[in-house]
């Protein structure tokens, strides 16, 4: 047995051993959020197969239910049924909308609710979410006529939204963020006139793909698809959605598979959307032994199985436009860099400082405690690999991706580790610890 839980928040991680078998990661978190949201504002019934039954999508579902949408209970392995209320059918809730720990929930809701003319909403969340910046969404929405108030001039929740009839136009996003872009696309669905959203770099495009499938009049153009135009007036209609496995969750097994001596894993049914496969490109740059098998398409999203085998890795350097395509995978790439002979560099990644935690600082703290050689910069990390990591006391600092990244690091350390805050993994991967125990030989 590789993992022992001794308390609700503390877990022993045993080093050594092999890693082999087949694993199917949970449904993609980004697609799960959007399927719930778009289904709720469509007309008719939407069914969702493979929806991620984790805390963040549960927060989205709870908010939508509070505004009148009917959503069946969410359980692993069960199809979720959403009865839509139409584009302008969401009602004022009786209480504050609790977005939990989910930045996707609160930011996409801002776009949707800012356009709900004549209704008033208050959005909040847990202590971590209340520290995350919201003006990146609020300011471009204000350019469309939105009225949003909150702490620090609207930058921090709780946020009060007074729904308005918004106006279209050409709106540039301040950062390459799928959350910001998606909020603006939702606002544009009922705006007065067409809206063109322009990103500084291409971010994940699940919203564009899915909104078109639901019937939105949406066109993508410009360099690398950075210009998205929405013409209002089209109703959305319920769809049957199949959610592929989340490549951000698969990333932990991919890195573990190339690092653990003798490892061989197959990760099944992984979404391979080109705006999300930066992790595969970096692992290929590192000469990792990864094959894509059984390529096919599900509900407009490319999908495949990934076979990974252990082998030596070369150091890597990442920056620029690839960062939005692997922003959630930087913590596990930092772990991989610790086991490459040579220096790896991550730059242009300041966005990680405003995730669930400051992930650059947290990963530096935790990996340094294990003996890693890391320099932290304003927008990234320099990691000199090849040092032996030591088992020690670790802390996820409440961040799900940190928790799972440290679990992989602990497998390869000398001596066991103890992880505080291991339950954070449930935000995106409820069965992570069970899968680790099953695969670790």
Swiss-Prot record:
Record's protein name: 3-phosphoshikimate 1-carboxyvinyltransferase
Subunit field text: Monomer.
InterPro entries the UniProt entry points to: Enolpyruvate_Tfrase_dom, Enolpyruvate_Tfrase_sf, EPSP_synthase, EPSP_synthase_CS, RNA3'P_cycl/enolpyr_Trfase_a/b
Positions of phosphoenolpyruvate binding: 29, 103, 132, 179, 359, 401
Chain's role: Catalyzes the transfer of the enolpyruvyl moiety of phosphoenolpyruvate (PEP) to the 5-hydroxyl of shikimate-3-phosphate (S3P) to produce enolpyruvyl shikimate-3-phosphate and inorganic phosphate.
Principal location listed in the UniProt entry: cytoplasm
Keyword presence, Cytoplasm: yes
Location in the cell: Cytoplasm
A Pfam family of this chain: EPSP_synthase
Cellular compartments per GO CC: cytoplasm
């Amino acid at each position: 047995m590789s993992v022992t839980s001794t308390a609700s928040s503390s877990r022993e991680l045993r080093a050594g051993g092999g890693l082999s078998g087949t694993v199917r990661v949970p449904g993609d978190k980004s697609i799960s959020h959007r399927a719930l949201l778009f289904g709720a504002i469509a007309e008719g019934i939407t069914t969702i197969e493979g929806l991620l039954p984790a805390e963040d999508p549960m927060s989205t579902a709870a908010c939508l239910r509070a505004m009148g949408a009917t959503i069946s209970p969410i359980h692993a392995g069960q199809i979720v049924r959403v009865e839509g209320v139409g584009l302008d059918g969401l009602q004022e809730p009786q209480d504050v909308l609790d977005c939990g720990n989910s930045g996707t929930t609160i930011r996409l809701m801002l776009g949707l609710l800012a356009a709900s003319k004549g209704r008033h909403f208050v959005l909040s969340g847990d202590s971590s979410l209340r520290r995350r910046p919201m003006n990146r969404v609020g300011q471009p929405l204000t350019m469309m006529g939105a009225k949003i108030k909150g702490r620090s001039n609207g930058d921090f929740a709780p946020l009060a939204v007074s729904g308005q009839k918004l106006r279209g136009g050409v709106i540039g996003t301040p950062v390459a963020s799928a959350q910001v872009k998606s909020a603006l696309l939702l606002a544009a669905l009922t705006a007065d006139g067409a809206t063109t959203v322009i990103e500084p770099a291409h971010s994940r495009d699940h919203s564009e793909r899915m909104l078109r499938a639901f019937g939105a009049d949406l066109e993508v153009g410009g360099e690398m698809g950075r210009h998205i135009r929405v013409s209002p007036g089209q109703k959305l209609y319920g769809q049957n959605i199949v959610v592929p496995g989340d490549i951000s969750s698969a990333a932990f097994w991919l890195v573990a598979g190339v690092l653990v001596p003798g490892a061989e894993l197959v990760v099944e049914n992984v979404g391979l959307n080109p705006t999300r496969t930066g992790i595969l490109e970096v692992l290929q740059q590192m000469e990792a032994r990864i094959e894509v098998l059984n390529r096919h398409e599900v509900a407009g999203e490319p999908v495949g199985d990934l076979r990974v085998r252990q082998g030596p890795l070369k150091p890597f350097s990442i920056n620029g436009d690839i960062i939005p395509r692997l922003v959630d995978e930087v913590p596990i790439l930092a772990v991989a860099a610790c086991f490459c002979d040579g220096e790896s560099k991550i730059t242009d990644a300041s966005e990680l400082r405003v995730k669930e935690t400051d992930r650059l600082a947290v990963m530096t703290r935790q990996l340094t405690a294990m003996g890693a050689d890391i320099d932290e910069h304003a927008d990234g990390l320099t990691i000199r690999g090849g040092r032996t990591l030591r088992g020690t006391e670790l802390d996820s600092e409440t961040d799900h991706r940190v928790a799972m990244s440290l679990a992989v690091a602990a497998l390869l350390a000398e001596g066991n580790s103890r992880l505080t805050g291991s339950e954070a993994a449930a935000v995106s991967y409820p069965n992570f610890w069970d899968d680790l125990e099953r695969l670790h030989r």
